Amino acid sequence: MKRILTLIISFLIWPTITDAQLLIPEPINLQSDNYKTFKITKIVEVIDTICRLEPEAYAITTKNGKVTLTASDRAGIVHARATLAQLVGVGPEEFMYDDAFIGKIAPETSIADKPAFPVRGFMHDTGRNFREIEMLERELDLLAFYKLNVFHWHLTDNPAWRIECKAYPQLNDPQYQRKGRDEGQFYTYDQIRAIIEYAQSRGITVIPEIDMPGHSQYFDKTFGFSMASKQGMAVLKVCLEEFMEEIPAELCPYIHIGSDEVYISDPHGFMQFCEDIITKGGRTALAWYPGLPSSENTISQIWSDEGRRASGKGFPRRYIDSYMGYLNLGNPIVNSANFFLHQLCSVESADNKAMGGILCLWNDVRVADKTKTFPHNGMPEGLLGFAQSSWGGGKGYEGARTDLFPKLGTEAYEALTAFEKKMSYHRDNFLKDWNMRWVANASTPWEVSISYQEKDIITEAWGGCVDLNAVCRENGFTAQVGDNICLTTKIHVERDTVITAWVGFDSPSRSTRMSDGIGKQGQWENGGRVFVSCDNNQTSTEIFPPKPWDEPEAYRYHRHTWHQAPNELPYTDEQFFWMREPAQIPLKAGWNAISLICPRLFNASNWHAAFIPVKQLSDGNISEANGLKFSKPSSLSSQ
């Protein structure tokens, strides 16, 4: 009886772990006796430099109220704390402090764990949109909680140089920075050192990026000549040497030199110039690939499909995969699945060239409310899948598809739907203060009817948000203006009811304003329409936006807006379906068909359709809508 009471109490306080079903990332070896629990009274950290544990690996043992965390380095101890925190219900803001654990109920357990890749990073662009120190520290807490170990800090871009400069203080002068882009805001050397030290205490290495010679409009405006000119290189040498004098190599062993999206007369000479300065400063250089030609000692960061095709066996240098990792592109719902299923560097674990990956967040468009940066771009949900694949290794799941949810019955489908349960758990228990705009949706089935060049194509898709361009590509063609796609799914309910669902027909990238904008008053964006019909009475009801648009027909740009005035117009919540109030969807008892009509109005880089049932909570957060049953597409089943 005493044992039963102990179990009941432990479940009431915090659910114990039966294997590794709730941990992100999942440990490679966890043994737990869930029938034995105890109250934590003491945490002991053991850094054993002569033990056999690899860098960042850790072990956890628990017994009689004491938890012992063992590692060969500080990073391993931090990772152990993160795992323990998830076991007992301590969040990202608290897990570095012992007091948060004392008194928590834990299972008797033994864990041994290590990462598959040595680089598991997150890049934030603060050159285009400045971010306060307090917000960066909070980000670092989140990264450490999910065992990321690199913060790639993009410190300069076209709008501004965000680093204190003593030699050339005019670089910090607001008059030379882009208007509206946080003029006059930059990081002092004291602040940079403080962020690096804060990160190091959490097992994170900071890689500052000074983008050269491209992405540097501020430089031309400040000095009247370009970075790649003879005068510009002289200025740059002084700036780089000052930075390395202020930020010593033990704090900053790597410096990213950018180098992409620019054309200059002597690319080899410029890159050798930069690499020589970095090397003489005792650092290792990183550069984007493709970009200007770099030496074999420089680490390449893959950012495009061209780079992905070139990397792999035979690539001449070490490299980091960011190809699939742009939070600001595409749709956050689709991205979250992509990041989980993507195999970093096309290998299961690191080798002498493949180092891992860095998840990137670029906001080319001006950001007015910095608290919206993460929810607008699908963070932290995108981080969760990336954390699993970068720590646990790329499994190369059968049935994984780029930009499309995997089909029912595939290995990828089973893995993703299982991982979604973890994501929901973390959203509800650790990430309530992060405005995570995501619910499990991979199992939503669709019958897809495509009208293409006077032909009708019937296929299927899965997931609450469907990339229509990807559907067309998978069927062997590129959609043209005038084509139409209809998505249909069926939902069964026991009684007449009204559910709420996110509905959307556009997913503008946060790096450009290319989209059809906000819909006409009373209509959905991008010409989309939604209908609900009940099998029992064959009546059809059209569903309209839940409330009037604040800015109907605004922000319609059918071309990319990089470096143009529209990119200075901040995005608002009503332009992203995952940020909006859910629509009311009346359902009748029995089977109800949901149909999304999606016309191709222009050749958009993003073309999505979404229908995602959600439950709006009283605190503003969201969760899954329960009690719904979906049918399979008719191409698979008659019901």
Give residue ranges: language-model regions.
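Bacterial Sec-dependent N-terminal signal peptides
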Residues: M1-L22, Q639
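An acidic-aromatic loop/edge-strand motif
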Residues: P545, Y555-S638
